[in-house]
Amino acid sequence: MVHLLAIGQYMQSHVLSIVIALLVSYGIGFLWHGPLFGKLWMEYNKITPPKKEDRKFSMMLPGLTANLVQVIVLSAVLGRTFEIVALAHVGHALLIATILWLPFTGLTIVNSYAWEGRKPGHMALDAGYYLVSFLAIAAVLYVTL
């Protein structure tokens, strides 16, 4: 219970850090699912890009909202963890983010995609996105501690 209160206090005192982490996460998402791997990601997900006149911002709102919640929770938990362990340098922040990503996101994606019969490339693309995002958020939180 004490740590839940501490996470809440962290969120209140580090609003700017969380907002920066959110913006960085959105930036990575737009690059990853756009110019870097957008065509491949759409191919894996069997998505036909809508015509330019049919594209609406509202189509992205569910995903953006889910990402908002994820980044707020991840930032609060990572930030509080960083306070507890008193990090010596950014490498420790990146290591902790990787350790948390591996069982809770990376392997969850692998297990889910394996059962769904998805291609290994699809698995790697999505798991890689989350790893890069976790690492970027960890770096932002470390720099703004």
List each language-model region with its residue ranges.
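Juxtamembrane/disordered regions of integral membrane proteins
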Residues: 2-145
